[in-house]
């Protein structure tokens, strides 16, 4: 314990460098959930997967752990080029003491800004820029993350809900057909969802639904 305290109180350059790296690592771990949710494609993916489960009316199948796990790995797959660039341009030089912490932050935010800008609607970005009374930026570097992140988040929410609406349509039709058949047969006390569930699962399996959903998500980026 004393050795750990001495690292923070030491003025030796090597110890100071180790202290900065440790603090940086702890900071990254503390803000990682927020970064993952709001600055990557995780938001769109997890919402679409949740819409799939809701439209099928399977309640807790697949479980939340499976959906979140799949969303995480899809996020890492889609964001791999961006993460690689951040590691190459910012993290590795910082760990090698070739650049300062401020330079590493500047270099790290460029790839993530570029990714977010590709999937952010101009209307959403203009909303936050106008509210902050910002001048029209000359380049992407002039847009702060405090403006880009919320604009990107609401753009992702809108896109995810649009995809979710398209997913709901075929299953809604099945529910309506089953409900009409049950009413015509006088079986109004029987829940239509109970009867339509096997047909919805059958349709989803026959069209290879998970493949189509994941393919659509990958192509949307």
UniProtKB/Swiss-Prot annotation:
Show the PROSITE patterns listed in the entry: FLIP_1, FLIP_2
Q: How does it sit in the membrane?
A: Multi-pass membrane protein
User: Which organism does this record belong to?
Assistant: Bacillus subtilis (strain 168)
Function (record text)? Plays a role in the flagellum-specific transport system.
Which residues are connected by disulfide bridges in this protein? none
Sections of the chain in a coiled coil: none
Tell me a GO biological process for this protein.
Answer: bacterial-type flagellum-dependent swarming motility
The residues that cross the membrane are 22-42, 66-86, 163-183, 187-207
Instruction: Please verify whether the record's keywords include Ribosomal protein.
Output: no
Q: What is this protein called?
A: Flagellar biosynthetic protein FliP
Any one GO cellular component localisation term in the record: plasma membrane
UniProt-listed Pfam families: FliP
The subcellular location is: Cell membrane; Bacterial flagellum basal body
**Family to which the UniProt record says this protein belongs:** Belongs to the FliP/MopC/SpaP family.
Q: Which UniProt keywords apply?
A: Bacterial flagellum, Bacterial flagellum biogenesis, Bacterial flagellum protein export, Cell membrane, Membrane, Protein transport, Transmembrane, Transmembrane helix, Transport
